[in-house]
C-alpha cells in the first residue's frame, strides 16, 4: 500500500510543472481557431422578396435605367410608382426693359419659353412684311424703306406694349416663388427663339420715327439707366458750351438743351452716337442713394434702380431698391414669394413727358396724322432738343415656380412607366419598347433576366423625379405548384365542367322546361286575376320586379341560358372567391397561382437556418432550451395543419359553390312565388357564404401569420461555436486514504465543441426591458407562439360561426353529441389523422425510448406491482399493465 501511494505521489509531482498554458498552448490556440472559423449562426431575416427603389429623373426620360435586380420567370414582379415628386417646370421669361420717349411707359419686350419646342417665343410681336419675295417674310429688324412705314405699324407697336395685340403679361399665382436676375443682352437676343423673332437687336443706321428699336446706345455699358437734366449732362461733356465743339449742348442753367448732333435719334431712345456715349459713360459714376434728375454731377443707375416691379398691383421692388449682388455667381437678382396672385408689371414713376417741347408719343402720331408726308414734315421741321435725358435698358430673366403646385391631370396622365427584362446586363437601346405598367402593377415575370425601367414623358414643361418601388419573389414555389397546379386546379376545373354540363342537361330536360313553363303560366294567370279583381295595388317598382322575374325565368329555358347566367351572374361567385383571395393576399409568389401566398409562408417556416437553430436548442437539455424547442416545433406542426385546413376549406367551398350553381334552374324558378321565394333567398345566401367563408378565413389566417413571424424570430436565438459538453477529469483518492481530490480539463479538449445558443442570464438590467432573449423571455414567447398556432388551428370553426351569423346560413347538426354542428373540414382532417396515425406512432417510438432510457435513465425496469428492480437491462416498459401488454401480444 505504501508503495502504491509513493507511485501516485511521484506521478503527481512529475505532472505538476506541465501547465496547460505552457506545454499545450498550441492546442489551445487550435481550439480557439475553430471558434473563429465557425463563428455564429445568426437568426435569419425572412426575405422571400428582393425589394428596391429608384428615382428616375424626367430629364432622363426615354433612357433605360438599371435596377440592378434580376427576376425569375413565372415569379411575382411588383412595381409601384408615384408622380408625387413631379412639379411643373418653372415658367421662364426673357424681359427687355427699355426707355423710349415715344411711349408713355417703359417698353417691355417679353419672350416666353416653350418647353415643348425648347424655344423662346415672342408672342404677339408685330411682324412686318419687308419683302414679299423674301424667303423669310417678316424678318427682323424692320425694313429700311421709309415709304413702307405706315401708321399701321405705329398702331401695332402701341398695342404690343399695351398688351392688346396678343402679347400676354407674366402671370403670378399666390405662393409662387419669383426669381428675377439681370443678364447680358446676348441672353435676351438668343438665337434659340421661334421663327427668329427678336434674335438680334432692332436697330438701323437710318432713322425711322415709326420703327421699333431695342438698342440703348450705351455701347459696352448695359443694364444701366440715365435719368439726368440736360444741364448736368452738358456740364460734363461741354461745360463751356463751346460753339465750335459739336456736343449738341446749348443754353445754360435750367434752360440747357441737348440735341443729338447727327440726327433726331433721341426720339427713339438713342441720344448719342457710339463714340460720344462711350466718352460720357466713362465720365460718370453710379448714382448715390436717393439721387434724382438734378443730381450733380450726372450719374447712372444700375442694379435695377430706376425700375419698379409690381405683382398684382403690389410693389415687390421699389424704384431705388437695388438687386442683390451674388458674389459666388457674379449675378444680381431679386427673390420674392408671392402672397397674392396677379400680373407682373415693369414700370417707373419717372415720366418721359416734357422731355421734348413737342409731342413725341407714338399714340398721338397715329391719331393726329393721316398722311405720311405730313408726319415726315412734322418730324423734320421741329426742334427735338431734350430738356433732360432719360434712356437705357435692363435685360432680365424671370423664373417663376412653385414646389407646392401639382401638375395638371393631363400632364400626369401622359407620364408612363415601362419595364423591360433582358437576358444580360447590357444597356438596352432607347428604341426598344417596354411593357407599360400602371401605378400598382403586379404580374408574373415573363422571362429570366435583369430588370430595367424607364419613364416616358412627352411633356417638357414638368420636372422632378418619378419614385419607383419594385419587388420580386426570390423564394421557392414548389409547394404551391404541387398544391394548386397538381391538386386543387384539376379539382376546380373538373367541377367547373361538371357544373356546366349538369346545368345544361337540366335546362334541356323536358320535365324541367314544362315545370318552368307551367310556373310562368300560373304566375301570369294569378297576377292577371288579382289585378282584375282589384286585389293588387301596383306600383312602378312592383311592375318592374314582376316583369324582371318573368324575363329571367323565360330566359332560363333558352339554349343560351348557361352563357347568359354564367357571364352575368354565376361568374360573380365562381370568380369572386379567386378575386377576393388574390386581392386580400399581399405577399404571393405568383399572380397566376391563387395559393402563391403559401410559398412565402413555407419559405419562412421551412427555413434551414431556423430548423438548425431549433435543433441546437434541442441539445440544451440541461438548461431547458430543449423544452422551448419542442414547444416551438410542435407549434409549427400545428400551424402547418392549420394551413392544410385553409386549403381544404377553399376546396370544399368551391365544390359546394359549383354544386349549388348546377342546381340553379330549380331555385331560379322558385323565386316566382312568395311561398317558395324563401328557398331562392336561402340559395343565394348559401352561394354568398361559400364566397365569404374562404375570404374571411384567409384574412384571419394572414393576420395571425404576421404575429407568428415576429414571435418565431424571438423564440429562436443565435448560436455561436463553443463548448457544448465540458469534459472534466477528476481524481478522488480520499477512499484510499490519500487526501487528494481535484479535477481538471484537458487544455487541448476542454469539451465537445458545437454550436451553443447565445442566451444571456437574467439580470436587473434586462428583466424589465424584455429586449434581451433571456430564458424567461424565450419561455414566455414560446408559450405565446404556441397559443397563436392553436388559434390558427381553430380558425375554421370560428369562421364558420362568423359566416353563419353574416349570411344566416348555418351548417347542419349531427344527431346526438349535444347536436354539435357538422364541420366538413374537421371531418377531412380527422380522416387524414387516422391515415397518418401509424406513421405518427412509428415516429414517436424512438422519441419515447430516448426519453425513458436517456433522459429518465431508466436502464433497469421496475416491477409494475412491487417497485423492485428486475435487474434486466433495457427491460420492457414498466408503465404498461400486464393485461394491456398481453392483449397487445395477441
Curated annotation (Swiss-Prot):
Disulfide topology: none
TM spans (from-to): 518-538, 567-587, 613-633, 651-671, 684-704, 775-795
Alphabetically ordered keywords of this record: Cell membrane, Membrane, Signal, Transmembrane, Transmembrane helix
Coiled-coil portions: none
Principal localisation: membrane
Membrane topology classification: Multi-pass membrane protein
InterPro entries: Conjugal_tfr_TrbL/VirB6
Family affiliation: Belongs to the TrbL/VirB6 family.
Name recorded for this polypeptide: Uncharacterized protein RF_0092
Annotated source species: Rickettsia felis (strain ATCC VR-1525 / URRWXCal2)
Amino acid at each position: 500500500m505504501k508503495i502504491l501511494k509513493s507511485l501516485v505521489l511521484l506521478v503527481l509531482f512529475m505532472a505538476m510543472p506541465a501547465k496547460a498554458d505552457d506545454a499545450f498552448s498550441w492546442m489551445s490556440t487550435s481550439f480557439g481557431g475553430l471558434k473563429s472559423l465557425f463563428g455564429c449562426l445568426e437568426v435569419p431575416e425572412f426575405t422571400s422578396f428582393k425589394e428596391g427603389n429608384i428615382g428616375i429623373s424626367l430629364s432622363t426620360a426615354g433612357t433605360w435605367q438599371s435596377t440592378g435586380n434580376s427576376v425569375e420567370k413565372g415569379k411575382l414582379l411588383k412595381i409601384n410608382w408615384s408622380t408625387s415628386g413631379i412639379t411643373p417646370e418653372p415658367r421662364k421669361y426673357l424681359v427687355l426693359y427699355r426707355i423710349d420717349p415715344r411711349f408713355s411707359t417703359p417698353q417691355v419686350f417679353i419672350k416666353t419659353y416653350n418647353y415643348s419646342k425648347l424655344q423662346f417665343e415672342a408672342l404677339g410681336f408685330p411682324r412686318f412684311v419687308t419683302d414679299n419675295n423674301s424667303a423669310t417674310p417678316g424678318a427682323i429688324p424692320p425694313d429700311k424703306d421709309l415709304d413702307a412705314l405706315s401708321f399701321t405699324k405705329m398702331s401695332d407697336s402701341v398695342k404690343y406694349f399695351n398688351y392688346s395685340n396678343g402679347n400676354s403679361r407674366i402671370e403670378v399665382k399666390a405662393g409662387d416663388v419669383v426669381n428675377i436676375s439681370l443678364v447680358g443682352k446676348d441672353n435676351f437676343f438668343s438665337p434659340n427663339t421661334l421663327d427668329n423673332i427678336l434674335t438680334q437687336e432692332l436697330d438701323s443706321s437710318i432713322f425711322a420715327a415709326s420703327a421699333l428699336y431695342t438698342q440703348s446706345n450705351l455701347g459696352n455699358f448695359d443694364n444701366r439707366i440715365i435719368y439726368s437734366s440736360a444741364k448736368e449732362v452738358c456740364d460734363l461733356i461741354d461745360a463751356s458750351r463751346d460753339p465750335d465743339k459739336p456736343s449738341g449742348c446749348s443754353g445754360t442753367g435750367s434752360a440747357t438743351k441737348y440735341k443729338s448732333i447727327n440726327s433726331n435719334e433721341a426720339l427713339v431712345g438713342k441720344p448719342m452716337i457710339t463714340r460720344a456715349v462711350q466718352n460720357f459713360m466713362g465720365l460718370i459714376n453710379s448714382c448715390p442713394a436717393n439721387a434724382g434728375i438734378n443730381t450733380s454731377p450726372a450719374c447712372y443707375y444700375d442694379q435695377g434702380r430706376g425700375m419698379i416691379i409690381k405683382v398684382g398691383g403690389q410693389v415687390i421692388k421699389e424704384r431705388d431698391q437695388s438687386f442683390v449682388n451674388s458674389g459666388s455667381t457674379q449675378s444680381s437678382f431679386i427673390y420674392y414669394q408671392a402672397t397674392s396672385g396677379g400680373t407682373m408689371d415693369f414700370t417707373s414713376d419717372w415720366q418721359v413727358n416734357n422731355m421734348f417741347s413737342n409731342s413725341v408719343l407714338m399714340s398721338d402720331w397715329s391719331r393726329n396724322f393721316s398722311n405720311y408726308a405730313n408726319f415726315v414734315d412734322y418730324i423734320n421741321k421741329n426742334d427735338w432738343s431734350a430738356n433732360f435725358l432719360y434712356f437705357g435698358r435692363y435685360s432680365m430673366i424671370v423664373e417663376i415656380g412653385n414646389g407646392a403646385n401639382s401638375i395638371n391631370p393631363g400632364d400626369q396622365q401622359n407620364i408612363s412607366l415601362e419595364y423591360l427584362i433582358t437576358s444580360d446586363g447590357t444597356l438596352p437601346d432607347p428604341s426598344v419598347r417596354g411593357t407599360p405598367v400602371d401605378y400598382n402593377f403586379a404580374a408574373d415575370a415573363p422571362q429570366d433576366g435583369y430588370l430595367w425601367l424607364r419613364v416616358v414623358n412627352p411633356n417638357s414643361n414638368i420636372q422632378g423625379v418619378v419614385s419607383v418601388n419594385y419587388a420580386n419573389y426570390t423564394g421557392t414555389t414548389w409547394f404551391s405548384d404541387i398544391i394548386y397546379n397538381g391538386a386543387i386546379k384539376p379539382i376546380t376545373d373538373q367541377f367547373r365542367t361538371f357544373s356546366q354540363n349538369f346545368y345544361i342537361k337540366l335546362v334541356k330536360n323536358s320535365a324541367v322546361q314544362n315545370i318552368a313553363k307551367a310556373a310562368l303560366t300560373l304566375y301570369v294567370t294569378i297576377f292577371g286575376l288579382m289585378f282584375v279583381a282589384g286585389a293588387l295595388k301596383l306600383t312602378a317598382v312592383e311592375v318592374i320586379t314582376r316583369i324582371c322575374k318573368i324575363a329571367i325565368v323565360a330566359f332560363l329555358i333558352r339554349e343560351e341560358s348557361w352563357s347568359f347566367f354564367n357571364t352575368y351572374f354565376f361568374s360573380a361567385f365562381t370568380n369572386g372567391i379567386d378575386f377576393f383571395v388574390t386581392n386580400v393576399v399581399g405577399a404571393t409568389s405568383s399572380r397566376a397561382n391563387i395559393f402563391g401566398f403559401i410559398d412565402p409562408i413555407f419559405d419562412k417556416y421551412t427555413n434551414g437556418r431556423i430548423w438548425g437553430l431549433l435543433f441546437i436548442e434541442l441539445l440544451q437539455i440541461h438548461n431547458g432550451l430543449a423544452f422551448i424547442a419542442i414547444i416551438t416545433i410542435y407549434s409549427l406542426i400545428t400551424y402547418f395543419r392549420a394551413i392544410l385546413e385553409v386549403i381544404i376549406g377553399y376546396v370544399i367551398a368551391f365544390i359546394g359553390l359549383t354544386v349549388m350553381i348546377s342546381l340553379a334552374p330549380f331555385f331560379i324558378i322558385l323565386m316566382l312565388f312568395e311561398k317558395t321565394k324563401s328557398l331562392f333567398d336561402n340559395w343565394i345566401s348559401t352561394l354568398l357564404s361559400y364566397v365569404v367563408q374562404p375570404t374571411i378565413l384567409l384574412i384571419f389566417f394572414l393576420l395571425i401569420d404576421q404575429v407568428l413571424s415576429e414571435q418565431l424570430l424571438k423564440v429562436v436565438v443565435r448560436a455561436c461555436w463553443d463548448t457544448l459538453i465540458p469534459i472534466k477529469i477528476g481524481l478522488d483518492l480520499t477512499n484510499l486514504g490519500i487526501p487528494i481530490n481535484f479535477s481538471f480539463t484537458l487544455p487541448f479538449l476542454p469539451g465537445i465543441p458545437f454550436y451553443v445558443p447565445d442566451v444571456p442570464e437574467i439580470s436587473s438590467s434586462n428583466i424589465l426591458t424584455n429586449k434581451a432573449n433571456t430564458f424567461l423571455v424565450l419561455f414566455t414567447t414560446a408559450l405565446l407562439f404556441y397559443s397563436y398556432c392553436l388559434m390558427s388551428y381553430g380558425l375554421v370553426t370560428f369562421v364558420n360561426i362568423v359566416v353563419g351569423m353574416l349570411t344566416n346560413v348555418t351548417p347542419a347538426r349531427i344527431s346526438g353529441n349535444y347536436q354539435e354542428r357538422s364541420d366538413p373540414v374537421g371531418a377531412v382532417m380527422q380522416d387524414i389523422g387516422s391515415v397518418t396515425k401509424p406513421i405518427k406512432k412509428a415516429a414517436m417510438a424512438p422519441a419515447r425510448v430516448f426519453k425513458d432510457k436517456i433522459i429518465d435513465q431508466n436502464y433497469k425496469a421496475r416491477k409494475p406491482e412491487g417497485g423492485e428492480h428486475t435487474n434486466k437491462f433495457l427491460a420492457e416498459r414498466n408503465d404498461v399493465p400486464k393485461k394491456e401488454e398481453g392483449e397487445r401480444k395477441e
